[in-house]
Design a protein with these regions (language model features):
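Basic, short loop/linker segments at the boundary and entry of helix-turn-helix/winged-helix-like folds
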Residues: 1-30, 72-75
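Short, conserved catalytic/metal-binding motifs centered on acidic residues
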Residues: 31, 46, 70, 114-119, ...
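Short capping segments at the starts of secondary-structure elements
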Residues: 38-42
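DNA-recognition alpha helix
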Residues: 43-62
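Active-site- or DNA-interface-adjacent structural scaffold in DNA-acting proteins
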Residues: 65-129
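Electropositive, glycine- and tryptophan-enriched low-complexity nucleic-acid-binding patches
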Residues: 129-175
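Short acidic loop-to-helix transition motifs that present clustered carboxylates
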Residues: 158, 183-185
Length: 186
């Protein structure tokens, strides 16, 4: 059986102290992802999703949570997370969803096509604090229809070094990258 997203979330370090952990971290992260896929955009909506669907989630994921964590617990857990560790968990999970052609013998003749593109998040700027809008870079595998990786671009940088870092992280062997024309520079 292939590893699940829950098993990858189990590897994310828990930001909470040892005592008083009523809820394991991995299920809370998984339930948060499911809540967001269902349209939740706030901590309260994530809490409401978990509370409403807790019995079904326990059955589907073979868990035994007696009650949903409070809104404040969800908020505390999510705000304390290490974003880089969570990103690694998502990347490792995405790698299991692929076709596996990178390691196959035909990787040189049939490369994995990966599109890399950056997007500015609408409404993410903060004029009061003089913060520019958030800009994200994503790598998308065409055949598998999944995002392999994404990263935030620093305010004082641009897409060019971010694309180079992303390509290095993903590895060049067996891949055909498509990028915007501005990346065709020395």
């Amino acid at each position: 059986m292939s590893p699940t997203l829950l098993s990858f979330f189990a590897e994310v370090p828990d930001p909470r102290r040892g005592q008083g952990k009523m809820y394991p971290l991995a299920p809370i992260l998984l339930f948060t992802v499911l809540a967001m896929l269902s349209g939740a955009v706030s901590y309260r909506q994530v809490h409401a999703f978990i509370k409403t669907h807790l019995d079904r989630l326990n059955v589907v994921f073979d868990l035994s949570l007696r009650r949903a964590p409070a809104y404040s617990s969800v908020r505390f857990i999510l705000r304390g997370l290490d974003g880089a560790a969570l990103e690694v968990a998502f990347r490792r999970h995405a790698a299991t969803l692929g076709t596996g052609r990178i390691d196959a013998d035909d990787a040189a003749t049939k490369p994995v096509c990966v599109a890399i593109d950056g997007k500015t998040l609408r409404g993410s700027f903060d004029a009061f604090n003089d913060r520019k809008a958030a800009h994200l870079m994503s790598a998308f595998a065409h055949d598998d229809q999944i995002i392999l990786a994404h990263l935030a671009i620093d305010e004082k940088s641009n897409e060019i070094p971010a694309v180079q870092d992303l390509m290095t992280t993903l590895g060049l062997s067996g891949k055909l990258f498509t990028v915007d024309a501005m990346h065709a520079c020395k």
